[in-house]
Amino acid sequence: MPARQSFKDLKDLILCDIGNTRIHFAQNYQLFSSAKEDLKRLGIQKEIFYISVNEENEKALLNCYPNAKNIAGFFHLETDYIGLGIDRQMACLAVVNGVIVDAGSAITIDLVKEGKHLGGCILPGLAQYVHAYKKSAKILEQPFKALDSLEVLPKNTRDAVNYGMILSIISCIQHLAKDQKIYLCGGDAKYLSAFLPHSVCKERLVFDGMEIALKKAGILECK
């Protein structure tokens, strides 16, 4: 397919975000995901535009859909950050002013002001926290338990482990965000949003950034 071919509408193509564990898709405004072993069963007929943070999963996609196009070079995000992941770049591209929290296998926090990425940090994801506690001491090998509030101090080890985990994440987000709007995406976004009253869950945030990138490249027509 020629690089300059353009599409009139999102429904004419499929966006793909290749992560470390799952491969996520957006077809028009419908979201779905797949393990790499199940890609062929999807039977995708439309043109695929993708980003990737995992080489093995990217190869799996290309084995099934060899005409899929990597859009990493289709846009420019203003930033001084060296080595910013393509998924973080796309999420930042979708926000003009605010704090972007991607709560996936790792939790990334990025600040954007007037369209420029100012910097960010990376925390372990919830599963990584649980694994770290398990490695630290037998008594800290506690199952994850969703908390309703951080207002009451825990009275047992299981709650204390989960409390410390969530408080460290929320405190970091609040420290960086101050009075800025917080946008959350990723698998644990909805859970974390309960502790951030002025936040907004945007499960399509990375795909919104991809849509903007394609429009800037002239591949998707602006509306």
From Swiss-Prot:
Free-text remark on how the cofactor is bound: A monovalent cation. Ammonium or potassium.
Top EC group: transferase
Binding site for substrate: 81, 85-88, 157
Any one GO biological process: coenzyme A biosynthetic process
UniProt pathway annotation: Cofactor biosynthesis; coenzyme A biosynthesis; CoA from (R)-pantothenate: step 1/5
UniProt entry keywords in alphabetical sequence: ATP-binding, Coenzyme A biosynthesis, Cytoplasm, Kinase, Metal-binding, Nucleotide-binding, Potassium, Transferase
Annotated binding of K(+), by residue: 102
Cofactor: NH4(+); K(+)
Active site: 87
Principal cellular location given in the protein's record: cytoplasm
Catalytic reactions of this protein: (R)-pantothenate + ATP = (R)-4'-phosphopantothenate + ADP + H(+)
Organism superkingdom: Bacteria
GO CC terms: cytoplasm
Role played: Catalyzes the phosphorylation of pantothenate (Pan), the first step in CoA biosynthesis.
Family of this protein: Belongs to the type III pantothenate kinase family.
Protein name: Type III pantothenate kinase
Source organism of the structure: Helicobacter pylori (strain J99 / ATCC 700824) (Campylobacter pylori J99)
